[in-house]
C-alpha cells in the first residue's frame, strides 16, 4: 500500500536480549483511519493515544502512527500543566523515536531490509543493561508521571540499572502520581506485581518512596525486617512463583495482601472498642477499601472477593459445629486458606490452625466429623458445669415449709 512500517518497542528489545517476546507492536506513517481502511479486521481504540488493533484469530497486532512534536505535528494534542492528556499528533519515524519513553524501547526493526534502526543510543544501553529516558527526564515525567512506574517495572523485569538522573528524580517527583487517574494506577499496579517480578518491583518502589502514593494506608506500617515487610515480600514471592509455573493469579488476592496490614490494625482497634472479631473485620475491610479506592480504583469484581478473604480469616478460627464444613464449600475457601498459610509464613503463630485445615481438607466425610467432634469435646472440657449450692437449696426448702 506504499506505507512504511517497523516492528518497535518491547518485542524488538526482548529479541535482542535473547528473551521470548510477549507480543510485537508496529509503528507506521499511515494514520489510524488509513490502517483501518487496509484491514477489515481492524478496530480503532483509545482517546489519549489513538491506536489500531488488527485482529488475526486470537492474536492482536497493535499498530500506532508515528508520533510527532506538539508544536509542529499534524493531528490533535492536549497538554495541561506539562501533562499530555491527548496525544494524536503525527510525525516522522525520527520524531516518533524521540517521543518514546526509554532508549531500549525505541529500537525499530525495518522489515524491508532486516536492520535495526536506533535513533537514541538504545543498543548501547542494552549492552550496558541501563535504563535511560529519552529527552529531559523532568519534562518526560511531567508529561506522563506513570513513566516513573514504568521505569520501576522495566528495571525489575529486565534487571537493569536506572540511570542516575532517573534514580534521583523518581524519589523527588513521586507526588506527580497524584495527577494520574485512579483507574490507570490500578492497571499499572497489576503490571508491576503480576509480571513475575513483583518482589523486585516492590523493593524498588520502597527504595524510591513511591508506595506512599499507591498504598498510603499500608506504606506507614512497613518496617524493614519486620512482620509487615516479610508479609508483603512473601505474598509477592508466592505470586511470582505461581506466574512462573503458569498458575492463575488474581488481583483480589494481590490487593488483599497489599492492604492486609491496615485492615489487621483497624480490626484490632475495633475489637478493643467492643466489636466481635467478625464484626471488626467486616467494618475494617469496608473502611480501608473505601479509603484506598480514592487513590487507586479497585473494581467490585475484585474488591468483593478481597473482603471475603479477610472475613474468612476470622471464620477459619470458628471451626465448631457445622461452620468448618460450610466454610469448606465456600468459593473463596481456597484463596482464604492460602492467605492463612501466608500469614503463618510471615511470622504469625498460626501453625496449629494451618495444620488442622490442611488435614481437614484431605479427610473423608466421617473423618471430618470426628475432627470437629474433637474440637467440640475440647470446648466442653473447657467449660465446667455450674452446680447449685446445697446450702442454698436447703435454705429454700426450709423457708417454703
Stretch-by-stretch model annotation:
Residues 1-401:
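Catalytic cores of the polymerase beta-like nucleotidyltransferase superfamily
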